[in-house]
Amino acid sequence: MSNSNSMSKSRFAWLIATFFGIGHLQPGSGTWAAAVTVLLWWGASHWIQSSWLLSAAVIASIAVTLIGIPVSTTVARESGVKDPGFVVIDEVAGQLITFIGAPLSWKYLLAGFILFRSFDIVKPFPLRRLEKLPGGTGIMLDDVGAGLYALVLLQLWLHFIAR
């Protein structure tokens, strides 16, 4: 592989891992990435047929997670930091997971945002253990888990409280 080809792959990894530079916003790069994800999901949802929203959320969540693992691994290795704070593609994946099956109203988008960020920051069992997995797997999976926790709570709220 040529040096310029590996450099362009590295640049791509940094671009995706930092969610197009959002990871460099301070303070709270993870919160910025999650907030932008909420806005992008809300915007994209107006272009997606409502009958396809569930599928779109699942596909987007899986795609971001599968792309996020190798790019996070690359950036962590190149930066010499196990879980760099500027890698925020994990927040994008977790936030998207939260919205699987959620209605598109500001109330549920805000609730999903707050739930996801809370679980991501607090890291209840076993999220801290997932974070210890090697490379991009650990970087991504604790946020995937936080997204799943937020998804479950949001769905419980929708089905039992918000009726």
Predicted regions and their residues:
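Interhelical loop and helix-boundary elements at the membrane-water interface
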Residues: 2-35, 67-98, 118-148
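Membrane-helix interface segments
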Residues: 11-12, 50-56, 82-84, 104-107, ...
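Short Lys/Arg-rich amphipathic alpha-helical segments
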Residues: 25-44, 56-60, 64
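Interfacial segments of multi-pass membrane proteins
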Residues: 36-49, 96-102, 154
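Membrane interface segments of multi-pass transport proteins and intramembrane proteases
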Residues: 44-59, 126-136
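Hydrophobic core segments of alpha-helical transmembrane domains in multi-pass membrane proteins
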Residues: 57-63, 109-118
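Juxtamembrane boundary at the C-terminal end of a transmembrane helix
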Residues: 155-163
